Amino acid sequence: MDQEEEEIEIPNYFICPISLEIMKDPVTTVSGITYDRQNIVKWLEKVPSCPVTKQPLPLDSDLTPNHMLRRLIQHWCVENETRGVVRISTPRVPPGKLNVVEEIKNLKKFGQEALGREETLQKLEVLAMDGNNRRLMCECGVHKSLILFVVKCTSEDEDGRRRIKGLDESLRLLHLIGIPSNDAKTILMENDRVMESLTWVLHQEDFLSKAYTIVLLRNLTEYTSSHIVERLNPEIFKGIIGFLKDVVNSVNRTSPTVRETVQSSSRPSLGKTEPSKLDHSLVIKQAVTAALMILLETSSWSRNRSLLVDLGAVSELIELEISYTGEKRITELMLGVLSRLCCCANGRAEILAHRGGIAVVTKRLLRVSPAADDRAISILTTVSKFSPENMVVEEMVNVGTVEKLCSVLGMDCGLNLKEKAKEILKDHFDEWKKFPCIDITLLTKLLSISPKGPKI
């Protein structure tokens, strides 16, 4: 056999478990597995866990360069150069703390020309593409400087104008590096203009910037004082609901501008490219989840529930669920918010008024998760107990709720779920009998049996 035809045997420990190719810049994660740096960074941006061990790995977790393995790979490449193997180059040393601090100083020089600020933001974003740099940037306070920069961008000057050059890039960079929980606790309490700035962004046209803003808002409200969360400005709720409406329109192909934003990450870019490699569709999905989490948390208070119902949240949540079929987490959150909005009469009325309200809740029952089941049955219980009987009964018959509740009684599921299903069927039994499509014999039999929990 000729030397050229001889198959080259590559040592297994030279291969990246993700790409199955020779590693160019091997780094070891805290889980003990070594990957090529570029591959593991991309992986962690979408899935925060070790591909091999499944151990949780935050995006900012340490990636330790494996210099010895890299030298072994380089030595092996040199030895096999005559067989067509190209030597991997030594990766550049990531910029250190001094570089980051210098860029922060540039960022703070708000009075400089816009081009200077843009270059600073681009340099910071390039730094943030390296997983090791993100923690360093947080230690240096990049996130704090960026938030102040966003506030300045959205604040009116003496002429009543806003200098928004660099605003979109700042929001994207904040999304990339995140905000440490310790700082998130105090940012809103120390500067009330932050909330004003984020509210302003939510009412602008740029769809992606609104997505970044909602994720940022969730990060800030998650750890801050409950008093701030309880008294959020109605304009914030209006902006969040408007964002969800835009998402629904993009899925339903009625908003071309938004749809292009969602799809742009999958198309090759021409000309000047942005340094960020964030997947736009993933960012929007994260923003939808963040928006629902904000609504779920804030709807604990009656004042906020009334505001959300008046702003049309019930209808938009139902439309979102219809459009986002198959997204488990989004379904669970949506049902959670709806179950809280059902605590007020107007919320229950809105669910009944929407043609798909009871139908979509019924359809998700027993199809998603135990958490979704609990929230769906809670909605049906509240609506059936406190809404006009004639409206509830007819709607539940028409959309198959009665049959689904009978299925709950006959399935191996939670005892609490069965008891609530039985309660609904029992409360309206006399009305169900009037409908020829209802199997009264089966219904009577099911109601006579004591509910039992799942078999162990």
UniProtKB/Swiss-Prot annotation:
Assigned EC number = 2.3.2.27
Task: Spell out the Pfam families in the cross-references.
Answer: U-box
Q: What's its job?
A: E3 ubiquitin-protein ligase that acts as a negative regulator of the immunity triggered by the pathogen-associated molecular patterns (PAMPs), in association with PUB22 and PUB23.
Q: Which Gene3D superfamilies match?
A: Leucine-rich Repeat Variant, Zinc/RING finger domain, C3HC4 (zinc finger)
Where in the numbering of this chain does the U-box domain appear? 9-83
What biological processes does GO assign it? defense response; protein ubiquitination
Superkingdom, taxonomy of origin: Eukaryota
Q: From the UniProt record, which GO molecular function terms apply?
A: ubiquitin protein ligase activity; ubiquitin-protein transferase activity
The yes or no answer to whether the keyword Transmembrane is present is no
The name of this protein is: E3 ubiquitin-protein ligase PUB24
Q: List the catalytic activities from the record.
A: S-ubiquitinyl-[E2 ubiquitin-conjugating enzyme]-L-cysteine + [acceptor protein]-L-lysine = [E2 ubiquitin-conjugating enzyme]-L-cysteine + N(6)-ubiquitinyl-[acceptor protein]-L-lysine
Q: How is it modified after translation?
A: Auto-ubiquitinated.
Q: Which InterPro entries match?
A: ARM-like, ARM-type_fold, PUB22/23/24-like, RING-Ubox_PUB, Ubox_domain, Znf_RING/FYVE/PHD
Q: Which organism is it from?
A: Arabidopsis thaliana
Named in its record, the pathway it takes part in is: Protein modification; protein ubiquitination
Q: What class of enzyme is it?
A: transferase
Keywords from the UniProt entry = Plant defense, Repeat, Transferase, Ubl conjugation, Ubl conjugation pathway
Q: What induces its synthesis?
A: By the bacterial elicitor flg22, and bacterial and oomycete pathogens.
